[in-house]
């Protein structure tokens, strides 16, 4: 993706800026958690993941578990290969947070999704 963006920027006479390029993925995820990002896993698509990941919070323990999956199955800790997708429910930039009222899990034995069926915005405490 970076190469594609750089090529397009070059064609348009723009410069590409990628401040997170070559940064430690586990470190970046831990910084997001410490900064107050609340995210959940909404899709897992790689060997090593189980359905228990669906709807799971991305927290310090999840980052450690992603590092273990990297060692055992080659999973990109940051999900850069499409191994997983997350949904941000809250972060310091949001004026309200997303509250999931109802969700369903789909699982085919190898991959699955956490499908949000009902959600609402709520004020922050």
Residue ranges and their predicted role:
Residues 1-125:
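Nucleotide-activated chemistry modules centered on ATP-dependent adenylation/adenylyltransferase
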């Amino acid at each position: 993706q970076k190469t594609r963006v750089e090529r397009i920027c070059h064609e348009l006479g723009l410069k590409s800026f990628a401040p997170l390029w070559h940064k430690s993925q586990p470190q970046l995820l831990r910084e997001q958690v410490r900064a107050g990002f609340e995210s959940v896993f909404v899709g897992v698509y790689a060997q090593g993941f189980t359905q228990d990941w669906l709807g799971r919070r991305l927290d310090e323990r999840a980052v450690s578990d992603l590092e273990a999956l990297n060692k055992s199955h080659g999973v990109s800790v940051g999900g850069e290969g499409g191994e997983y997708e997350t949904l941000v429910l809250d972060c310091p930039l949001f004026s309200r947070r997303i509250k999931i009222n109802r969700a369903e899990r789909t699982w085919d034995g190898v991959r699955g999704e956490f499908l949000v069926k009902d959600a609402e915005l709520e004020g922050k405490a």
